[in-house]
């Protein structure tokens, strides 16, 4: 394993005329691949969950750097293994697929590209008059004015639609309710300054809640509250407007400032504004970071002139006239108080350090991943060690550089557990990632996965703390137990304490909703039932292929290893694992069958003269169909990405995630995207989501 990097530069310090690049690749893993299909699927699920939490909750599942790193690793794994992604993480223009809302944006609210340092330097060299703005750690909103009066405010959401938050942003500092007399839109960042972040955390702690992890999560959590608890604590900084679309950027911002808006640029110190060129401005801002009264993790460079912006144009996910620069990580010393273990959904041993809480770049770090046994032993980190905690473009938070010179004489090297800490069974140590294969050690993760919308039975409301509470009460030991729950049992499930010290329960109303979701889940297609069993190598893709090949759960259970191996993409080794796990899961499958869960229907032979499936070629083979971009607003809009994939295969086609010479049809919601351009180059037929929905309905494919 390669050691963690030893040389790190402070924020904003040029090195050899450039800025210090920082690359903390995970030792032994880097950007290469995941160890198994389960790890890859778990990573996708984690990223999708983090994307939703980013826009809608006060929980910091990942910050930007962690999310970007995980997304890059997912893409690297897919490329290395020839996987055609079924998720929309690479297509979304918001934060990784966050949910939409009830307000449609006039134009998509796009993210900014965050390229490597060399690309930022190249951008600055090409555009020496580019202007700089702080990259504020807040929440993007768009605000519509008619006749100078605020009429609508919405969160970014998925970039196309967002939640209406008009009444929750009235009176925000820097965001006037009346400004001018025209019709226009202003976009900007809703954020917490340091003083108001402290006030918000005091309110939370008085209510018996943990403080917000950082300012951005504080904004998300506070915006979700509609009772006025946090009134007057938000601030707003504008970064774009349509008030005069022919005006240069600086002129537009100055016009907004004259109307009473705070702009992002107006928050910068004069030393930054006086810098001679873009990279000098980045250096000046880096030197001033700790003196600002708000959290920022980077700088944004924007082309100033409207003419040059129009010439550069827009990409499918981000404008081409702006880039974001991420400052090198800030490090703070802390102490490893303990080394803790956890068993994940697939039985993987996860190891983390519990740290003396320390604020690193605006958020409190209390835990850090220690990756795996081999990494931890190679780094020789011990309980009681003083280490450096940092945030970088990796799975974070992380620690490195244990100070051996500060160790107590009684310090002992860390020893890994000899058996699973939960069930005392031996680990499978055949790979770098140790696993416990006993089912009881990963129930929580399996239930959450089984209930998920993206891959499982789509039981809304049953993940997270509710699932854990059911497990702790021994009401649920596997996915089949969900279908034997009673409404009264659910209503009495304890979820913690109320603000007054009482016991908070799920309640009858929420229990009734979940029971309705469980009943609905009984009719999910066979492929989702297979995937919900959380068996290795039975994720969404193979779940669909197994369901299509065997038709019923009974036929799948009766299949031989050789029959399983003949399914596209499975092969002998995976077939052996699936065959063995089907045997182990026989009691669970029996309970699901008894509960009335769909077990599929036998494949019927086509009737004489019957028409071929709608998405097949003249020779009867399935058409390779790729879907990219948003399908919102079309007849397909109610379907998740997995739902669209299932529709394609139900109609006889093969769902694919990338455009190639074998692609027969591209369903594209974003003309001009990379997949659109590649399909044009290859002469592949391209249709809109509306056209595709009509074609499938009419059978004229």
Swiss-Prot record:
Keywords: DNA damage, DNA repair, DNA replication, Ligase, Magnesium, Manganese, Metal-binding, NAD, Plasmid, Zinc
Record-annotated BRCT domain positions: 615-701
EC number: 6.5.1.2
Gene of this entry: ligA2
CDD domains membership: BRCT_DNA_ligase_like (cd17748)
Protein name: DNA ligase 2
Catalytic residues (UniProt): 135 (n6-amp-lysine intermediate)
Family: Belongs to the NAD-dependent DNA ligase family. LigA subfamily.
UniProt-recorded Gene Ontology molecular function terms: DNA ligase (NAD+) activity; metal ion binding
Residues where NAD(+) binds: 64-68, 111-112, 133, 156, 189, 302, 326
GO biological process, one term: DNA repair
Compositional bias per record (Low complexity), positions renumbered to this chain: 603-613
Residues annotated as binding Zn(2+): 420, 423, 436, 441
Enzyme class: ligase
Annotated Polar residues bias: 1-10
Cofactor annotation: Mg(2+); Mn(2+)
Record lineage: Bacteria, Bacillati, Actinomycetota, Actinomycetes, Micrococcales
Its biological purpose: DNA ligase that catalyzes the formation of phosphodiester linkages between 5'-phosphoryl and 3'-hydroxyl groups in double-stranded DNA using NAD as a coenzyme and as the energy source for the reaction. It is essential for DNA replication and repair of damaged DNA.
Residue ranges of the region described as Disordered: 1-21, 603-623
Gene3D superfamilies on file: 3.30.1490.70, 5' to 3' exonuclease, C-terminal subdomain (1.10.150.20), BRCT domain (3.40.50.10190), DNA ligase/mRNA capping enzyme (3.30.470.30), Nucleic acid-binding proteins (2.40.50.140)
Catalytic reaction annotation: NAD(+) + (deoxyribonucleotide)n-3'-hydroxyl + 5'-phospho-(deoxyribonucleotide)m = (deoxyribonucleotide)n+m + AMP + beta-nicotinamide D-nucleotide
